[in-house]
Amino acid sequence: MHMSVLCLGEVWLELNAATAPELTEAFRAQTGGWGAGFCRQYAALGGQAALLAQLGADPFGRKLAARLARDGVDCSLLCFTDAFPTPVVFTGADTALPYRAHTAGLALGPEQLEAAPFRGVSAFCFSSAGLVDSPLRLAHLKALAAARDAGALCCYLPRLAQAAPYWPQREALCQTALQFLDRADVLFLEESDLLLLFGSRELRTALFALFTGHVQLIFFYKKDRILAFTRSVMASAAKKDQSPALVLYRMEQMGIHVIDLPQLREHVLEQLLSNDANTTECQGLPY
């Protein structure tokens, strides 16, 4: 089956409470993990999204896989292990208590990845929670190489504020994120990412540092606006429902590939940022 987007990350059982976890007696079970959430959003738009992750061969792992499949996510690349359990995270009142050390998700190593699933994929996406020091971080490096060899767009969504509770030290998180920024073709950034990485929410202070390595396109999500930059042009739009999943879905529908990124013009960026939820086609070439 052709997959337009492939995400690498973790899937965990998220037990959510209305109050702080230590104060509650009832939790609501949810599917957690950035990659799982992104794939579900992409599938809801009508796109094909596959999740590359490892779960425990336990009831929790099987339940999460069934939920993802029910939501339209391609689960053919999920793997299961008897050696580690499915991770569990307790959340509530802006608090996250992760139990993921020595669990299946972080134990996914590069030796378990093959190049074949990356062929024909339009984009490979990853975030920061899974870059913690573990076999999974090494798997990210191999996946990036495989995606680049296959000609897929490499997209990094740092989401540092959301990833911070899942790292032992915030400084290590930021240092690792800086090491991965220039490995991506496309960055989806938030103001909190800039604050943690560069000490400022102002993008202009960081643009020079960001446009290095493979980076050709940056989407910057502010409180009320979204900005898009290539190395030569920019566009902006009022922020509404233009999630990274929607923007990437539009890129896939427009047929934008890695080789097209340096040539994108302002009108194409404007279509990608459009408030019109039905905007998925670009007339003519994308540049």
Report the location of each language-model feature.
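Conserved post-catalytic alpha-helical subdomain immediately downstream of the catalytic base
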Residues: 233-287
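Hydrophobic beta-strand scaffold residues
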Residues: 49, 75, 154-156, 188, ...
